[in-house]
From Swiss-Prot:
The gene is seqA. GO terms for biological process: negative regulation of DNA-templated DNA replication initiation; regulation of DNA-templated transcription. Its main location: cytoplasm. GO terms for molecular function: DNA binding. Keywords: Cytoplasm, DNA replication inhibitor, DNA-binding. Homodimer. Polymerizes to form helical filaments. Negative regulator of replication initiation, which contributes to regulation of DNA replication and ensures that replication initiation occurs exactly once per chromosome per cell cycle. Binds to pairs of hemimethylated GATC sequences in the oriC region, thus preventing assembly of replication proteins and re-initiation at newly replicated origins. Repression is relieved when the region becomes fully methylated. This is Negative modulator of initiation of replication. The keyword DNA-binding applies. Pfam families: SeqA, SeqA_N. It is found in: Cytoplasm. GO terms for cellular component: cytoplasm. SUPFAM superfamilies: Replication modulator SeqA, C-terminal DNA-binding domain, Ribbon-helix-helix. Residues 93-94 are annotated as: Interaction with DNA. The lineage of its organism: Bacteria, Pseudomonadati, Pseudomonadota, Gammaproteobacteria, Alteromonadales.
Amino acid sequence: MKYIEVDEELYRHIASKTEHIGESASDILRRILGLQVESVVQDAPEEISHPSLERVSPKPVKVAKVITKMTSTAVSDFTSLIDADVLAAQKGAVGRFLFILDTVHRASPVQFEQVLQIQGRDRLYFATSKDALLKASKSANPKEIGQSGFWVTTNNNTAKKRTILSEVLLQFGTDEAQVTDIIEKI
């Protein structure tokens, strides 16, 4: 496996051509270029540079804590549980993605463990620890979903976040119309 750097516009174009969760960049490029999609033996790199993992001291961020009493019974109508004002106040797509996942967790904490089944072909999206996601992918950029104890990888583009959230909502029995409405809020 070789690693290359691409500019943002090219990255977005390639990512927009994703057809299913877990599809690799190589598979997407092979499809775009009309090459045969086949299994290729991938050599592991000796060392990978991860500039995105280098940390600069973060500025303190004020976090508004929203506490809503939820029941532990199964919930499939999440649209009414999402506070539009609080959602709009979230920072970027990652903030909105995490907020909606936290809302799902608070609505059905007992059933939330089923999100651990959502995985890509070679990709882990959810785990119960930051280390598990980092072990699966050094560039996962894991974030905790509220105070749930569940972690999600956040280094995906917005389209992939929507696909992941769609899978989560469908597992909870949310109807297609609501899923579409909710994922568009990211």
